[in-house]
From Swiss-Prot:
Keywords per UniProt: ATP synthesis, Cell inner membrane, Cell membrane, CF(1), Hydrogen ion transport, Ion transport, Membrane, Transport
Gene this protein is translated from: atpH
Protein name (database record): ATP synthase subunit delta
Assembly with partners or alone: F-type ATPases have 2 components, F(1) - the catalytic core - and F(0) - the membrane proton channel. F(1) has five subunits: alpha(3), beta(3), gamma(1), delta(1), epsilon(1). F(0) has three main subunits: a(1), b(2) and c(10-14). The alpha and beta chains form an alternating ring which encloses part of the gamma chain. F(1) is attached to F(0) by a central stalk formed by the gamma and epsilon chains, while a peripheral stalk is formed by the delta and b chains.
Family assignment from sequence similarity: Belongs to the ATPase delta chain family.
Location(s), subcellular: Cell inner membrane
Cellular component GO terms, alphabetical: plasma membrane; proton-transporting ATP synthase complex
Organism: Bartonella henselae (strain ATCC 49882 / DSM 28221 / CCUG 30454 / Houston 1)
Gene3D superfamilies: N-terminal domain of the delta subunit of the F1F0-ATP synthase
Molecular function per GO: proton-transporting ATP synthase activity, rotational mechanism
Length: 197
């Protein structure tokens, strides 16, 4: 899988529609195939500025939106015709329920739901300096043992944290950076001086 997803909370509407699509895909035994169809649709949505504008615009009628979404689905060469039909019907439901503006979020939430069903997670790592491959492997191994699944590391370097790491996995954050420790020390010293010590 090219993408993995963290556990950062999504809007409830996105989650509910994504879960409904996931449940349908599971019932039909088409989770992986539908995931590819969603990926194809999202690629078109990301690349077509007119379609992006259309999806976000409140100025089109539901009838026009249904027609355009059907046309878009007809023109995407889905790997599996059944998955394309399920996605097309799902887009129709979203459109009829006036949720087209949430389309991108819903489809990304579906991808995330599929990744979670495979126990795949994404961790954001901020380091003061680049990690070597051994450090990356150790960190990945520790995080995988914590979550009980596959963890993909997204590592960025920020020299401003001075040292240590900031790890974000889902809604949790572990901050072992030197900057955070200095900030804590500063607060403790201010408190002590305010207390008269």
């Amino acid at each position: 899988m090219s993408n993995s997803f963290s556990l950062i909370p999504l809007p409830l509407v996105d989650q509910r529609y994504a879960q409904a699509l996931f449940d349908l895909a599971q019932e039909e035994g088409l989770v992986e195939i539908l995931e590819k169809a969603v990926e194809s649709f999202l690629m078109v949505l990301d690349q077509d500025e007119d379609l992006k504008h259309f999806v976000q615009s409140p100025f089109f009628s539901v009838k026009e939106q249904v027609k355009v979404m059907h046309s878009v689905c007809e023109n995407i060469p889905f790997a599996d015709e059944g998955a394309g039909q399920i996605l097309s019907r799902f887009l129709r439901v979203i459109t009829l329920n006036h949720r087209l503006r949430a389309l991108s979020g819903i489809l990304h939430a579906f991808q995330r739901r599929v990744a979670l069903s495979r126990r795949e997670f994404s961790a954001q790592i901020i380091a003061a300096r680049p990690l070597n491959s051994q450090q990356e492997q150790q960190l990945q191994s520790v995080l995988e043992s914590v979550v009980g699944g596959k963890v993909f590391l997204n590592i960025c370097v920020d020299p401003e944290i001075l040292g240590g790491l900031i790890i974000r996995l889902g809604s949790s954050q572990i901050d072992t950076s030197l900057m955070a420790k200095l900030s804590s020390l500063k607060i403790a010293l201010k408190k002590r001086s305010a207390d008269g010590y």
